[in-house]
Amino acid sequence: MGVYSCVGVTEQSLLRYADSARTAQQLISQTLTQLSGYALLLLTSRRQATLAEGALALARQSVVQAAEAVRALQAPEPAAHHYHHMRGAADMLLEACVAATACRGAQDRSDRRFDTLICALRATSDHLRATARLLPGFELIDFGQACCAVHAPRLPGQGL
């Protein structure tokens, strides 16, 4: 009584890590969604996305917060692989933000800067998916797999 076993200490540190990491992962995921929306706007709109500049500024702030949150994590040994992917997601999200900023004003959709942006967004998403497989509680939501997605009746003229 009152003495912690090695297993108990590890479990407690893992729970503390998971709690802190979940908050950071949610911030990364939300910011990834913001940057992906901004990228979609850049790629599909012929006009400059001046209204979206505020969204990009907020995304920049969120990217910095997410990176700081990940750097502050103290991963116990059992969470080292998970932490590796959290760092990867935060790093790639920073790259995506830099790339999104660089894409402003690009007129040609075949511009290499868009490739850099898309690659960084995809890599961030890949790292987030890896975190979902490594520890419980980090699963990403796939609305395409929701029960209503399979059973919802399709109306005439509604795509696939």
Predicted feature descriptions by range:
Residues 49-56, 81-87:
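A ubiquitous short alpha-helical element
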Residues 1-53, 99, 103-160:
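C-terminal amphipathic alpha-helix
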Residues 27, 31-34, 38, 59-69, ...:
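Amphipathic, well-ordered alpha-helical segments in soluble domains
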Residues 6, 45, 59-62, 68, ...:
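Generic structural signal for short, flexible, solvent-exposed coil/loop and linker residues
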Residues 65-86:
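Short, solvent-exposed, charged loop/turn and helix-capping segments
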Residues 56-63, 86-93, 121-125:
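Short amphipathic alpha-helical coiled-coil/interface segments
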